[in-house]
Amino acid sequence: MRRNLFVSSLLLIAATSIWSQPAFASENWVGTWKLNTAKSNFGSAAVARAQTLKFEATPAGIKLTSEGMNPEGKPMQSEYTSKFDGKDVVWTGNPSADMACPMRIDDNNYENVWKKAGKAITTAKAVVSNENKTLTITQTAADPQGAASGSVAVYDRQ
């Protein structure tokens, strides 16, 4: 009886450990990425002087932390945690958006709709290169007058 209880306890611990591991570790964008301004194209938009994106797999989902310097040279930081399931999550620290709606497409691709006051304002499509060394984020948006704008930000894996 004691042996069965002991074996059952070990199996329960093993199963709990396996199930508590983040299911997001296979997402190739998980890791740290540094903006490569030389390879990026921001059009006429003001450009961040520096930016680092850190995607971390957690039990609650993938946590994205963005840190850097804005075009005026002031520090900036924003973050959200999402299961990348297409559901809105709070995005703190982003002056352009208060909600993110990231949706996983596959291990190398996801799409994120930025929202402000409930209205979609920007769509970002992220693609990790086949060699997993480059993250390219293509953003499209419309200004208040409805004119389209866009940018392509290229990040190198750190």
Where are these regions (language model features)?
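Bacterial N-terminal signal peptides that target proteins for export
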Residues: 1-10
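C-terminal segment of classical bacterial N-terminal signal peptides
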Residues: 15-22
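Hydrophobic small-molecule pocket/channel-lining residues, especially in calycin-type beta-barrels
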Residues: 22-158
